Structures are given as structure tokens and as C-alpha cells.
Amino acid sequence: MSHTHFDLTALPQSARYKLLTATVVPRPIAWVGTRGSGETGKLGFNLAPYSFFGLMGSEPPVVAFAPGDRADGTPKDSALNIGSGGEFTVSLVSAALAAVMNLSATDFPRGMDEAQALGIQLAPGRRVQVPHVAAAPAALECREVQTVSIGRTRIILGEVLGLWLREDAVLDAEKHHVDTAALDLVGRMGGRGTYTHTRDTFELGRLTYAQWQEQWQAREEGDHSEK
């Protein structure tokens, strides 16, 4: 099967965005909550979704998301608030919350409280002072550890200090077993408002090298017996 190659270094930003967001899918959605303090205190609480997001490790537990910058090159409210206070929350988005999450991406004026405008109820944090979306099936409490800027790409790394999980998704709290399907999370597909469910799943067991050798040898012996 043939492939088409795109030289991204020779393409404008709009083309790179279209190609990559349509290819790197599905992407989990970070519904990021922040609160201004000090010089940015006037910004108040901000709630915004980002699909340039992922879990980066567990020792320490780290997530990363990329809020980028505004069209005029200035930081978005999320980045400004985190830069001043360091704390933020990531509410994960279920199918039931997808519509209101999408509304929170509206280009509200700087400093406008999206949660208040949209009637989104918030729940207080335990390890951080920033609230999270009360109806979210899961939420992460984070503290910024590093922000990396590459051109107009701004990547915020946050250590996860606390995790909220809806009770019906916790199968065994002592053994830390989670019913992932019960979270009913959605992901981003492409860059123009297309989303996906996470309900259609399949499992593949991880093999040890010894198990792989055994299977490979059995297959080789089967191939020879057919000749």
C-alpha cells in the first residue's frame, strides 16, 4: 500500500494543524480549571478544554497539556493563571458533559467566568485551592512543575497531587481497581468539533519474551508441517 508524505517544515501552520489533529487521534480532553492570583487575580476562575493533553508518567505522576497562545501571541487565561498560582485542576469529560464542555470553548471575553456563565457547578479541591467540575466522573488536582515554550507552543507539565473518582467507577478502593468504562469518557477526533466515545474497546495481553518465543516456535513448526 502506498503512502503520501507531507513535509511539515514546508507547510503553513494551518495545514500542519489540520493534518496532525486529524491523524493523532483519539485525544483525551483536559477540562482545565484555574484561578488567578496576585497580578492575575482579576481574571478570577477560568474553565477551558484542551485536547493537546496526556498522562506523561506515574513516578511522579505527571500530566501535560498545551494551551497555546491567543491569535495575538498573548497567553491564554489558563496559562496566565497557572503561571501566577501554580495550581490547576483537570476535569475529565464524559459523554453527558460533552455539549457543555464544548460551550466552554466559546471565545468569552478575558476574565469572564465560563462556569458561572454556563451554570456549571463546581466542587472544592482537597490538595489544591482550585475547584473542579462537580459532575465530572474524574478530576485531577495538579501543581505546575515546568512550562516549556517552543515557538507559540506552550506545554504545561503538572504533578498530579490528588484524584477524584465518582463512586460508581471505583470497583475496589483498597486495591485501586477502577471501572474505566463507567467513566464514559470522550475523546477528540480531528480539529473541527468531532468527538468519539470510549465504549468500543478490546483487550490484548502483554507477552513475556519467553511466551513470545514459545508462540513463534509453535507457528514456525506449524508452517513447516504444512509444506
From Swiss-Prot:
Cofactor dependence: FMN
Source organism superkingdom: Bacteria
Q: Name one GO molecular function term.
A: oxidoreductase activity, acting on the CH-NH group of donors, NAD or NADP as acceptor
One Pfam assignment = Flavin_Reduct
Q: Which UniProt keywords apply?
A: Flavoprotein, FMN
Cystine connections: none
Of which family is this protein a member? Belongs to the flavoredoxin family.
PANTHER family given for it?
A: FLAVIN REDUCTASE LIKE DOMAIN-CONTAINING PROTEIN (PTHR33798:SF5), FLAVOPROTEIN OXYGENASE (PTHR33798)
Instruction: Indicate what this protein is called per its UniProt record.
Output: Uncharacterized protein DR_2585
